[in-house]
């Protein structure tokens, strides 16, 4: 079960439509923000900001095959990379919030209580890079989500939720047939929730497989 609130805004020539989605059931701990943006702004940077009732000098950022803790912005380090998620857990360790996303990778942390995610950017350019003054122009669709958690950061749980956001189940129609793999089939699995299988391929010069 899902409820959605649609918010429409205009800024200059740009149009913004955002759906805030609340769920019941196994996704009740997640709030989704689905966005449709027609971006037509030059010399502009669009961020979303999460001012949280949480205090910590460090946040944890996803690196794809690991994570790293980083502090607040400085004069020389004010935008950092993260892939699927970033997390701010209160210094007490009693609770925290993970921010998930499906396609945006620039983050910053201006103070102990705030996470920000960069969404779109059209930089100011000089004549040598004039072709960049329409960077990110056009239509964009993307989702970011808020997930709260009790206690400290459970990286395995956060990674699982981020993977669910990014690797959505896809359904399609097909004719009825017996198939060759049966009703269930798995190429490979892990019984350790702290181990993620990211890739599986056959070796080039043997019958072995590389994980």
Label each residue range with its predicted role.
Residues 1-210:
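C-terminal (or distal) subdomains of carbohydrate-active enzymes
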């Amino acid at each position: 079960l899902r409820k959605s609130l649609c918010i429409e805004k205009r800024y200059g020539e740009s149009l913004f439509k955002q759906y805030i989605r609340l769920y019941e059931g196994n996704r009740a701990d997640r709030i989704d923000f689905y966005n449709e943006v027609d971006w037509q702004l030059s010399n502009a940077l669009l961020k979303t900001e999460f001012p949280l009732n949480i205090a910590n000098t460090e946040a944890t950022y996803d690196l794809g095959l690991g994570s790293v803790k980083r502090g607040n912005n400085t004069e020389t380090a004010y935008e950092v990379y993260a892939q699927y998620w970033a997390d701010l857990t209160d210094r007490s360790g009693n609770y925290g919030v993970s921010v998930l996303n499906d396609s945006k990778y620039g983050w910053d942390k201006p103070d102990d209580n705030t996470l920000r995610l960069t969404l779109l950017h059209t930089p100011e350019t000089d004549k040598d890079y004039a072709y960049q003054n329409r960077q990110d122009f056009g239509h964009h669709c993307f989702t970011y989500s808020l997930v709260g958690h009790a206690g400290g950061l459970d990286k395995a749980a956060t990674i699982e939720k981020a993977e669910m956001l990014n690797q959505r189940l896809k359904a399609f129609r097909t004719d009825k047939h017996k198939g060759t793999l049966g009703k269930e089939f798995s190429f490979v699995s892990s019984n350790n929730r702290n181990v993620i299988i990211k890739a599986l391929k056959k070796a080039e010069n043997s019958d072995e497989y590389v994980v």
